[in-house]
């Protein structure tokens, strides 16, 4: 259902408030640069710091700015099932194409609990669901076996896997229903993920280098692996630089270097990228030819 380069969009702030005009400008630039779909209100979008009203404004602004040119996969996850349902219902009413649902974090549900969570979401809304597995943040890990069971739910259409376990790509491909979409959640693993059957990546780096990431995705889709490897190598330092300090500090700083209209402002408890991180980002932007 989804493929290619899909940025997990940053949320721009100015003087502490959501900067809607800048966000709309960012979305328009992304689409024009070849981005395949958009994810507002994910981790990179600092969703834990957004009020419900802000969360919905970000989703609505993204849908309005995208104007039907590319799909919008709205971040709707929560460790409270009722809250996730509320987010999904708003996203669907606003015209989102799918919901990104992170594994319930902090309260550490069992595998059976996670299945029950996603079934409850599917029962409450027919909005397509992209399951997001990122055990490094959530602690709870959706096992490959559980993921294959979740894929039996008709509206669970894809997984964003950021476990770092590439073997899961094969397990999912062999065990999930035909056509189930696999998206990488790790930029630096996008190439091997694609070789093993992945359709694309929900990317941090694509915030900053959307054209390069779109070109890389196109090379993978065409099976042009020599070209894909060359682009992977060109982007690799930038992939790593995006996590040279706590995300999204580095990617917001990088965007401020690419566009003078973008502010690197973040919200507590995230703080701006350190001097050392900024130096790493500057070097990576230069080596990739982004600046």
UniProtKB/Swiss-Prot annotation:
Has keyword Secreted?
A: no
Q: Which InterPro entries match?
A: Aldolase_TIM (IPR013785), DapA (IPR005263), DapA-like (IPR002220), Schiff_base-form_aldolases_AS (IPR020625), Schiff_base-form_aldolases_CS (IPR020624)
Query: Which pathway does the protein contribute to?
Result: Amino-acid biosynthesis; L-lysine biosynthesis via DAP pathway; (S)-tetrahydrodipicolinate from L-aspartate: step 3/4
Q: SUPFAM superfamilies, per this entry?
A: Aldolase
Which keywords belong to this entry?
Amino-acid biosynthesis, Cytoplasm, Diaminopimelate biosynthesis, Lyase, Lysine biosynthesis, Schiff base
Top-level class of the enzyme under EC nomenclature = lyase
Q: Corresponding gene?
A: dapA
User: What coarse category fits the chief subcellular location reported for this protein?
Assistant: cytoplasm
For this entry, the protein name equals 4-hydroxy-tetrahydrodipicolinate synthase
Q: What does this protein do?
A: Catalyzes the condensation of (S)-aspartate-beta-semialdehyde [(S)-ASA] and pyruvate to 4-hydroxy-tetrahydrodipicolinate (HTPA).
Q: Where in the cell is it found?
A: Cytoplasm
Among Pfam families, the record links this protein to:
DHDPS
Q: Which domain of life is it from?
A: Bacteria
User: Record's Gene Ontology CC terms?
Assistant: cytosol
Alphabetically, which GO biological process terms does the record hold? diaminopimelate biosynthetic process; lysine biosynthetic process via diaminopimelate
Q: Which residues bind pyruvate?
A: 44, 202
Protein EC: 4.3.3.7
